[in-house]
């Protein structure tokens, strides 16, 4: 099939998927939705899924990208929240957990007026697939105002579009509907970070050993495993420049010379780099929030950009980072 036909087919199916998502997805439906077993779905976005994800995100128990699906990341966040509140953990939303989450009674959505800054760009025409092709780009910015706004509010682009039929994301002054994840305040100061290489999760604990934050992650691989044992945070670098070392031997990267990729949200390590006390390893962001915890990394710990920024705000130089290899309970497999 010629490239043009493929592109048109992809665009058509994306349009159909967005239209299907938009059906029944509005502020009133989200605000009134109760996250019962029937109202949640792993495969499709639902108003109840959006409301649940928003409540978890506000509590610093991140479901990753808010897309309205009750997928693995949302389920992991739900179990971690129950653990933190010393409530029975379950893959379903219990009455006790839902009551605790609703202590934050703000509406799950709000309106936002697009600013000149939101549409200023410069935007990339296309994000190169190969790292080598990124090295000559002066800034690894967003590909569109829609992508920028979706990340700003921790949302998938599809959900943002579904909530705003007919709206233009590239017009300053346009008022749009977004999920309300709050002011982005960081969790309390973390005394310890715990990274589970099996479950692909990041947890923050305070001095009393209370669980104060949870984030889904992509952690290592068989080819490029993450470290073991206890490391420490050595540097916190917002908007990092990515430096590729040929000694990494990343699959798909053929350069035999070092090269660097300039900062930006679509930089390979996103908007934040938290350096660890093992050469070449860190906790960082990503250009692909939709893939978090659904694949593996090159050995580092990959989070959504907004979650990497929240972790960075909660740790400091010297904070211990413990790598564990938890085993899934039989029922959770």
Predicted segments, located by residue:
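Extracellular LysM carbohydrate-binding repeats and other cell-envelope/extracellular binding modules
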Residues: 72-119, 161-192
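Secretory/export targeting leaders with adjacent low-complexity proregions
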Residues: 135-216
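Gly/Pro-biased beta-strand-loop elements
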Residues: 186-286, 317, 329
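Boundary at the C-terminal end of the N-terminal hydrophobic targeting segment
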Residues: 19-24
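N-terminal targeting pre-sequences for secretion and organelle import
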Residues: 306-333
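Solvent-exposed, polar/charged alpha-helical surfaces in well-ordered, non-transmembrane soluble domains
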Residues: 47-50, 54, 72-80, 95, ...
């Amino acid at each position: 099939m010629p490239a043009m036909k493929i592109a048109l087919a992809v665009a058509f199916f994306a349009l159909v998927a967005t239209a299907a998502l938009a059906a029944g997805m509005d502020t009133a439906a989200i605000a009134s939705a109760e996250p019962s077993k029937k109202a949640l779905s792993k495969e499709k976005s639902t108003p109840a899924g959006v409301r649940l994800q928003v409540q978890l995100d506000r509590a610093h128990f991140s479901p990753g990208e808010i897309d309205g699906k009750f997928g693995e990341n949302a389920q992991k966040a739900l179990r971690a929240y129950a653990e933190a509140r010393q409530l029975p953990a379950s893959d379903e939303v219990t009455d006790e957990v839902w009551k605790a989450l609703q202590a934050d009674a703000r509406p799950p959505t709000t309106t936002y007026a697009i600013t000149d800054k939101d549409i200023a760009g410069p935007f990339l025409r296309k994000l190169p697939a190969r790292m080598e092709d990124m090295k000559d780009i002066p800034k690894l910015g967003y590909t569109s105002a829609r992508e920028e706004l979706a990340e700003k509010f921790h949302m998938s682009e599809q959900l943002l579009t579904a909530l705003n039929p007919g709206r233009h994301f590239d017009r300053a002054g346009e008022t749009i509907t977004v999920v309300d994840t709050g002011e982005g305040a960081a969790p309390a100061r973390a005394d310890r970070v715990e990274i589970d290489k099996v479950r692909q999760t990041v947890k923050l604990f305070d001095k009393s050993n209370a669980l104060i934050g949870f984030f889904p992650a992509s952690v290592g691989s068989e080819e490029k495993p993450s470290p073991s044992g206890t490391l420490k945070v050595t540097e916190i670098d917002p908007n990092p420049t990515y430096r590729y070392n040929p000694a990494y031997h990343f699959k798909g990267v053929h350069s035999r010379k070092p090269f660097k990729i300039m900062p930006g949200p679509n930089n390979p390590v996103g908007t934040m780099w938290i350096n660890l006390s093992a050469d070449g390893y860190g906790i960082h962001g990503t250009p692909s929030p939709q893939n978090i915890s659904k694949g593996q990394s090159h050995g580092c710990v990959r989070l959504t950009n907004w979650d990497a920024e929240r972790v960075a705000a909660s740790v400091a130089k010297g904070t211990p980072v413990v790598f564990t290899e938890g085993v899934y309970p039989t029922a959770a497999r």
